[in-house]
UniProtKB/Swiss-Prot annotation:
Its EC number is 4.2.99.18. Belongs to the universal ribosomal protein uS3 family. Residues 231-243 have a biased composition (Pro residues). It is found in: Cytoplasm; Nucleus; Nucleus, Nucleolus; Mitochondrion inner membrane. This is Small ribosomal subunit protein uS3. One of its GO terms (cellular component) is mitochondrial inner membrane. Signal peptide: none annotated. The gene is RPS3. The lineage of its organism: Eukaryota, Metazoa, Chordata, Craniata, Vertebrata. The modification N6-succinyllysine is found at K132. There is a cross-link at K214, K230 (Glycyl lysine isopeptide (Lys-Gly) (interchain with G-Cter in SUMO2)). The modification Phosphothreonine is found at T42, T70, T220, T221, T242. PANTHER family: 30S/40S RIBOSOMAL PROTEIN S3, SMALL RIBOSOMAL SUBUNIT PROTEIN US3. Methylation by PRMT1 is required for import into the nucleolus and for ribosome assembly. Sumoylation by SUMO1 enhances protein stability through increased resistance to proteolysis. Sumoylation occurs at one or more of the three consensus sites, Lys-18, Lys-214 and Lys-230. Coiled coil: none annotated.
Amino acid sequence: MAVQISKKRKFVADGIFKAELNEFLTRELAEDGYSGVEVRVTPTRTEIIILATRTQNVLGEKGRRIRELTAVVQKRFGFPEGSVELYAEEVATRGLCAIAQAESLRYKLLGGLAVRRACYGVLRFIMESGAKGCEVVVSGKLRGQRAKSMKFVDGLMIHSGDPVNYYVDTAVRHVLLRQGVLGIKVKIMLPWDPTGKIGPKKPLPDHVSIVEPKDEILPTTPISEQKGGKPEPPAMPQPVPTA
C-alpha cells in the first residue's frame, strides 16, 4: 500500500529532490555545458531531461555515461528498477542561457584570460544571440589584495515586478583562482517571443503594439450608396402583352 502524504509535504519533497538532483548534475556535468534539468513524472516512470550545450559528452561513448548517471540517480533517490529514465537535450540558444554563459565565463577566467576581456566577450555573445539586455558582475580579488566588484551592462534590464520571474534568467558561479575565489553573476533579459521558443509568450505590461491600418480601396468608378432609410423594394416584373 502506497504511503499517503499531504500536498504540502509532497511539494516540499519534490523541491528537495529537484534541488539535490540539480546540484549533483551541476557537479558532474560542469565541463559539458550543463544548463538545467526538467523532471516529468508519469504514472509508470519518471523522466529526467538534462539540458546541456554538449549533449554528446553527456551521453558518452555508446550511451555509457548516461547509463552510469541513471544508475547513480536510481540508487541515490531510491527509485525502483527501470522506473527512471535520463535523456540529454541540447539547449536551443546557448547565448540566452545564463547558466551556460556563467560556466563559459568561469572557464575563460580559469584559462587565464583578463577579467575585462572575458566579460566583454560574454556580453557581446549574449547580445548577438538576440537578448534584450544583460548584466555580468564579477567580484573578488580582481587586482591587488583588496576585493572589488566589476559590473558590465548592455541593453535593457528590468529589476522589479512580476515580469522579472519569467523575463530574467539568472545564474551564479564561483571560480577558484590563485589570488582567491571570484564570484560570477550573469543576468540575461530574454526577448518577447509569441511562439515561446526563445523567450516568454507573455509581453511586458508596458509593451505597446501598433496595429497597422488596413489598406483603403479607392473607387475607380463613381458609385452611389444609400445610407439610412428603408431600402426600396425591387420593381415587379411587368407582364408581357400577348397578341
